[in-house]
Regions:
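Conserved Rossmann-fold cofactor-binding substructure of NAD(P)-dependent oxidoreductases
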Residues: 42-64
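Glycine/proline-rich active-site loop of Rossmann-fold NAD(P)-dependent oxidoreductases
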Residues: 111, 162-165, 191-200
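N-terminal Rossmann NAD(P)H-binding glycine-rich loop of SDR-like oxidoreductase domains
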Residues: 3-23
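Substrate-positioning beta->alpha
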Residues: 135, 153, 179-189, 200
């Protein structure tokens, strides 16, 4: 399949690229620094650009079979540019009839907030993570209001552990659970062809 990956130079994005190529997919990586990937992945196609540039996003989306997004920000401030980027991705996919979108969000967003413990729910999220959570909620809203075949993945606490292929997924994730980015990528790639979680927001953890 022709897969387009946004946020491909991030930790989860690189895992998506590596595993997608290993599975035989034709991968296009979209990133502001996409050239960083060519040394490690010589067969990859790259598009260097910013997701806020609608024309570049549209060009990238054309001809793809599915889109995966690992877009994220390390800042604790609001990131309206990423929300604009997700809107551009969704609109381009609708325009060019690319149906499947798999988006990485986070545990604690939306109704999954009730799954986290008291400290995280009432202190850490309101005081520390409120902007990051609000950004994810804005982006999820855009995706859910679209006519795409979407899956929003909400991983537990992320680690840089090994790719095991063994994890739990579903609507309920235990507070304090962890999962390696490599296994998040594994789960996300499965959603490209699996309809079980279509238009759902599964959590994923060990």
């Amino acid at each position: 399949m022709n897969l387009l990956i946004f946020g491909a130079t991030g930790d989860t994005g690189r895992e998506l690229v590596k595993q997608a190529l290993a599975q035989g997919h034709t991968v296009t990586a979209f990133s502001r620094h996409a050239d960083e990937l060519t040394a490690d992945f010589p067969t990859i196609k790259t598009i260097e650009g910013d997701v806020t540039d609608k024309a570049t996003v549209e060009k990238a989306v054309q001809g793809q079979d599915a889109v995966l997004s690992a877009l994220g920000s390390s800042s604790l401030k609001r990131s309206p540019a990423l929300t604009t980027g997700v809107r551009n991705i969704v609109e381009a996919m609708e325009q060019y009839n690319v149906r499947r979108l798999v988006y990485q969000s986070s545990l604690g967003v939306g109704e999954s907030r009730k799954q986290v413990g008291f400290l995280v729910r009432y202190i850490i999220i309101p005081l520390v993570l409120r902007n990051a959570i609000a950004d994810h909620e804005d982006k999820e809203r855009i995706i859910k209001q679209s006519n795409l075949d979407w899956v929003i993945v909400r991983p537990a606490g992320l680690t840089n552990g090994d790719h095991t292929g063994e994890y739990r997924s579903g609507e309920t994730i235990d507070f304090g659970a962890k999962i390696a980015r490599a296994d998040v990528a594994d789960f996300m790639l499965k959603q490209v062809t699996d309809d079980a979680c279509l238009k759902k927001t599964p959590g994923v953890s060990y």
